[in-house]
Amino acid sequence: MVKVKPVQNGRTTRMSFSHINEVIGMPNLIEIQKNSYNWFLEEGLHEVFHDIAAIEDYTGNLVLEFVDYRLDKNPKYSIKECKERDATYAAPLYVTARLFNKQTGEVKEQEIFMGDFPLMTDAGTFISNGAERAIVSQLVRSPGVFYGSSKDRTGKDLFTATMNPNRGAWLEYETDSSDVYYVRIDKNRKLPVTTLLRALGLSTDEQIKQFFGDSEPKINASLEKDITHNTEEGLLEVYRKLRPGEPPTVENSRAHLNNLFFDPRRYDLARFGRYKMNNKLSLTRRIAGYKAAEDIIAPLTGELLAAKGEKINMAKAEEIDNAGVTRVTILVEKKGEEPRPFIVISNGCVNAQNFFSFDVEAEAGVNERANFAEIRKILDTTSDVEEQKELLRQNHDVLISRTVTVDDIFASVNYLLGLDHGIGTTDEIDHLGNRRVRSVGELLQNQFRIGFSRMERVIRERMTLQNQENGEITPQSLVNIPVSYTHLTVP
């Protein structure tokens, strides 16, 4: 006699004729789509509005802020009606906008209709012009810093590195057979890496050698190739490579470099990129198994963490890393050569929980490795627990930077130098650990971000025109329906 048993698959009950019980039940295959879309509604849209912050006119007199948003819970048509009428299943999106006139001190606040927002069905699809469509998730390269290697004709190892964000300009490092390290900024013409180091603050040859080590042959070779000699010349040379044909000035170059890498509106590592960056550039895995070339002292307490000549195990390396130590000199050995010192430099991020008595993730929202210099400022400012919590919340974006930092760039160059000595590892970029799924919520967020950046330019121009006409300026007149709908419509 055939035994039939009921099997629950989501909301559906099916009858199974199998003799062997299932080990794992059928997963909810549309859960990823629905969870991603819900994240976009609850957090993704908020991040887009937060990135915009305030829109100022060219004179700095008028400021438009997006305070809040809400989605109407009652769509115009049901799913069935949308299919019958060839309509789009959507709900109105309303945004509360506040206009501040600095000259008169007048504040106007209005709720503005920004267009129809596409809604997801229970099946994880969208209804567009009566047709049911699904947004396919993308498998993309994860943001972070990744290292590779190749060999030249003589069999010499040539190391490369790529620092790619979720959104923004790329940094690509490469070396040639003459031991010169080059860098490409945003896929432009290459220049010696020391030129970029000068532009970021290491002005003289002595400062660069002192920071990375006097006896690093690739730093010395890059310095010989470098035609600049100080920070100003470095900034001008970087600007010439990025903007050929334009007259370079120190101010323009500094502003352009800041916009490329340190402006959150133009550069974004995202949370996963920051995690990968911190994990790669930390000290722990790079100093474990080596002997300390000098005493290692905790910067906050003055405690001796490792004595000169002591071999550092993994537990000790993790303790050193989380104590806020950013530079460790270790001894590296090569066959037939005497041990020589090598400076290992981290990006200065630590586990914040080690420095506070309360749960920093639950009570202050610090859920990633945080910048040690900022933690130290907070500890020096106050010892009161409640004040520390408040300062952690206020400085969250500085503690966990979504952009690349100068320390990240310095540490990435140091990691590249260490590969020559067998310190660190190269990455397999096709490994799934270095890939991530970009699902529907993030794709929608990126589309809205593009739309808002276009709309921002139109609003700024409208501010200037209406200000010159001396007419009544309201948030509604600046953000009218045709403008917002044209730029925010998701294709």
What residue spans do the PLM features occupy?
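N-terminal non-catalytic structural scaffold regions of very large proteins
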Residues: 1-488
